[in-house]
């Protein structure tokens, strides 16, 4: 009988000691030292999202919406990019017919005074100049073509007209492959975003987007654009 009591007492004492050790030493230790990898992963995701949001905000006012009514009554919509603060805009030649009613949407304002300065069917680029308030004409920087990397994170921004009113739209992806003549992304989009600029995550211009019949987004590279506009 005495032996059983001693056994119970010893078990009780060991249990108390284990409880004190866990409560006073182990538990505070794990509270003070949380699982760092999980927190680091969350911080990386938050930082990446913040970088994209900042880049979008940086380039938003440089993106131009284009809406044309042709002589035959057809409506054509697309986008372009402001390249100088005196009103130079570059977009795709296929967007601008030689005749029609043209309207350019810049930072929420409609501009109808313009002049086509240069057109190149081979590169599918057109340069025009609009008359607008200088404060409304904001530009983005040009990305160095030689620094573009496979797998690099990129985004496009364009203007769509779902109900005749312009709305800016963003989509993101990566550089799938590239040559001197084009940059292929993994982005798929509607052809209403034809002419939309492609940017890197710094908000620098990489090219202007052509969207094929399957929705694949391919950009005319910045090297061809700069050579065409002379900048």
Regions found by a protein language model. Name each.
Residues 80, 112-115, 173, 196:
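Small-residue-enriched segments and motifs
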Residues 67, 81-83, 115-118, 176:
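Conserved positions in beta-strands of structured domains
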Residues 15-43, 48-52, 56, 135-139, ...:
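C-terminal cap/linker of serine protease catalytic domains
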Residues 84-165, 182-183, 214:
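Conserved active-site neighborhood of the chymotrypsin/trypsin-like protease fold
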Residues 3, 7, 59-62, 66, ...:
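Active-site region of chymotrypsin-like
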Residues 76, 124, 194:
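Beta-rich catalytic cores
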Residues 1-15:
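N-terminal Sec-pathway targeting helices
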Residues 23-88, 92-94, 100-101, 105, ...:
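N-terminal activation segment of mature serine protease catalytic domains
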